């Protein structure tokens, strides 16, 4: 039998196959491969002595580290302008991860009843990213996102409290995902999604819901000099630098620095580039 892993909890895998869900508690001969099955994987499994065993996992087209999922087309990055306030460094890390894995990132600014900062909106639109404003009070705004991801597998990501579960409640009318109020004491959203789970919206469309988190490591990059390849707006200018190895920091005749001075590159994005660069560099030292 063949199916898609839709949930994994403590070594138990739930596989959806032909409208049935099978609970797989053992890995069988697949255990020898030392490859951990992930939500989104296509698994081949068999029944043996009343249990279902995974025999193999089909080749993945991609794999994310956090959230840890496989075979996705879109990374839906959900943020909100306030409560919790938008974390642009985290957003830029998500974008780097998406670019690295050749996954289309879609930025969703939820709770649009709170006025979005046009600077932030235009900053990402102008470099070619899709940005949607959504609100649970505006069904049409969420419907536009659904139309954009139809026929594909998308993963919801972002900090706690930005409204991912509210979006899921709309997108998947037959499922109920618990939503909690913002914790005013900590001024952080309470995490209500406890595990990664894939939901089928229709026969061709799936959404993977994930727990919220407030940090993201760029462990998939081995060297800090790799980072520049995944900053989208750099691509237009990088071949105009004097040195091919230019890191766009202190090198002479750097086209990126020139474009920064001319305000063709966002100072906010560039500052986040420097922070990510130093973070990767510091980790490599140790």
State the predicted function of each range.
Residues 111-162:
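Canonical P-loop GTPase G-domain recognition
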